[in-house]
Amino acid sequence: MSMLNKKTIEDIDVCGKKVLVRCDFNVPLQDGVITDENRLNGALPTIQYLISKGAKVILCSHLGKPKGEAKPELSLAPVAKRLSEMLGKEVVFAADDNVVGENAKKATEKMENGDVVLLENTRYRKEETKNEENFSKELASLAEIFVNDAFGTAHRAHCSTVGAGEFLQERVCGYLIQKELKFLGEAVANPVRPFTAILGGAKVSDKLAVINELLEKVDNLIIGGGMAYTFLKAQGYEVGTSLLEIDKVEYAKEMMEKAKNKGVNLLLPVDVVMADHFAPDATPIVTEDANVKEDYMGLDMGPKTIANFVKTIKESKTVVWNGPMGVFEFENFANGTLSVARAMAELTDATTVIGGGDSAAAVNQLGFGDKMTHVSTGGGASLEFLEGKELPGIAALDNK
């Protein structure tokens, strides 16, 4: 994969140069307070390296979906404040509804080596998501070097992820993207076998391409979560009122056939935990087999299924997981997700990669994050990467 061999911040001289860094500061805010700092922590190594090498560091990011207008509640001001505390030095916030207006120009003109400026939310400008040249040029006018360290938006061709870099002398990746390419890339390109992929989450339709692609590569494919019921239906089981994409049942049959032809061990639920309504206090009932009673919905994997999944995980040398096994937000239906996370965390001689999104949230929430080889910072991006797609934000960077 040519995407794996990209120049990094360590391959270029940054001293005294203005460096525009696209970070992923799309963090959850409550009353102006950041409630989850994972993404800020992820950005620190790159920022600290650039400061230590005497670069003039200009940070940019989007936050939420302001849809091309200035929305005070989506300002990056709280991020500048928190970053200042984390770095132990002032991060100057260029409050500027135009992102690259007078304030931003003033803040970036008088920078000394090692200074840090954070620009306002790039999606305040409607041009951002359309990758329009005028905004890309404005962003580029502030700097000499472009660094992309936002894996979470690497699958988007926007001004701040792709466009701005085209007008600068050098385009490299930061540590975060470098790590993503190393672990996600290596896991898929050269896995130590047995290689097991675990897919969960609500929809088969979100993961059509990824199922197809992984069947070319894996030894075992585990399917759980809401998407499993479409496969169970394809096997002829009753699914009650469980999540079901009836128009994807044929596709599920094709994938089961493909797994057989490729010699891939496809693991599906053999029992589930069901309830008669969707709520945290719903009574969990374990089914005898994979059939769900009429008017009941499957909300988690059953004990026999979990035992099968865990056994396969324990025999693996590479495990990639994307999407929860059940409604892990409800304690009564979190056992499948918890058991998979624990089994992966207990592997000592294996590469374990969590593919962002809900599974990353689940693993961090359950306290297993630091036991994994790598927890990806990108949900959609990691899925597209696993599909073997070229990600625009990475393709645009200079090759080594």
From Swiss-Prot:
GO terms for biological process: gluconeogenesis; glycolytic process. GO terms for cellular component: cytosol. It is an enzyme of class 2 (transferase). GO terms for molecular function: ADP binding; ATP binding; phosphoglycerate kinase activity. Substrate binds at D24, F25, N26, R39, H62, L63, G64, K65, R123, R156. ATP binds at K207, G298, E329, G356, G357, D358, S359. It is found in: Cytoplasm. Pathway: Carbohydrate degradation; glycolysis; pyruvate from D-glyceraldehyde 3-phosphate: step 2/5. Keywords: ATP-binding, Cytoplasm, Glycolysis, Kinase, Nucleotide-binding, Transferase. Its main location: cytoplasm. Monomer. Belongs to the phosphoglycerate kinase family. This is Phosphoglycerate kinase. It comes from Clostridioides difficile (strain 630).
